Amino acid sequence: MSKEFEAFKKTLSPQSLKAIYDETRLEIADDHAEGTEAFSVAMASQMAINIVEAYQRWLAEQEE
């Protein structure tokens, strides 16, 4: 993995991951019933997207 990603991972606290989880849950709540397989798949997919977006924001901040 890149040095940048390793540095980003160190910034992820339980609180920041919980915030990403909560944001993700709100994003998919209207589309899938919680507890279903579809919810789990959507949650995992959207969490991955949200973490990548957080990484991109972090990279942009590091360049400033």
What would you call each of these model-derived segments?
Residues 1-35:
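N-terminal acidic leader/helix
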Residues 26-64:
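Short, charge-rich amphipathic interface segments used for partner binding and complex assembly
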